[in-house]
Amino acid sequence: MFINLNPLEQFSVYSATSAILGSSSNSLAITSLTNIAILFIIGLLVLTIFQISASSHLIKPTRWNIVLETWVASILGIVKDQIGNDAKNSLIYFPLIFTFFSFVFISNILGMIPYSFTPTSHISVTLGLSIAIMIGVTLIGFSKHQLDFFSLFVPKGTPLALVPLLVLIEFISYSARAFSLALRLTANVSAGHCLFGVISALSVSACIAVSSLLLKGITITLPLAVLVVLYGLELLVALLQSYVFTLLTCSYLADVVNMGDH
C-alpha cells in the first residue's frame, strides 16, 4: 500500500513515478510525493516568516512580532560572530543563513507531529542541502580570492616536501564537510524518531501480553510518561540541530570570506 497507518512510514521512500503511474519497476526517481509536498509547505512557511518579519512595524509589537524579532536577532548574532561584524558581509550572507536555519528548524518541528513527515530524516534532503552549501561556499571563495583560494589547502609554514600530502589531506577534509554536515543532522533527527517507535512498539506488545488490568495500565502509563519526556527532549534537539547546522555553515563561509585575515 502507498499509505500505512504507521508513524514510521516517513522513513519509507516511495518512488514518485511509481506512485503516479502505478508501477514499482523502472522508476525514474526516488523522491517521495510526501517529501515534495512537505518541502513545498516548508518553503511557503519560510517565505511567510520573511514577509511578516519584513512588514511588521508596529509601535506595540505583538508576541508573534517579538518571537520573530528574537529569531532574526539570534541568527544575525551568529552571522556576526562567525563571519565578522562587517555590516556588508552580514547583510549579504544573513538572508541565506536565516533561510537555512528556518528551513531546517521548521522541518524538524513539523516532524514532531504524529503521522507527519520529517524531511531532515532523509539523507537525500540533508545531503542535497549540504552539497549546495559547499558548492556555494567554494564559488564565493573563488569570486573573492580567485586563484588565492587554493591557499586554503596549504597551511602556513608547511615544508615544501609535505605540500602534496597536506594538500591532499586538506582537500579530502574540505570535501568531507558536505557529508559530515548531512550525516550529523540526519542521524540525530532519525535517532529520536526511531526511539519513539521502539518504545511505542514495546508498550503495545507488553500491553497485549499481560492479562491483568493493573499491569495493562502500568504498561501504558510508564511508556507514555517516557514518551512525553522524550518528546520535550526532541523539541530541544530540533532547535539544537538547527543551530549546529547554521553555525557550521557560517563557519565554512567564514573560512573563505576571511581568508586574507588569517
Swiss-Prot record:
Pfam families: ATP-synt_A. The chain crosses the membrane at residues 30-50, 64-84, 91-111, 123-143, 149-169, 195-215, 220-240. Coiled coil: none annotated. The keyword Calcium does not apply. GO terms for cellular component: mitochondrial inner membrane; proton-transporting ATP synthase complex. Mitochondrial membrane ATP synthase (F(1)F(0) ATP synthase or Complex V) produces ATP from ADP in the presence of a proton gradient across the membrane which is generated by electron transport complexes of the respiratory chain. F-type ATPases consist of two structural domains, F(1) - containing the extramembraneous catalytic core and F(0) - containing the membrane proton channel, linked together by a central stalk and a peripheral stalk. During catalysis, ATP synthesis in the catalytic domain of F(1) is coupled via a rotary mechanism of the central stalk subunits to proton translocation. Belongs to the ATPase A chain family. This is ATP synthase subunit a. The gene is ATP6.
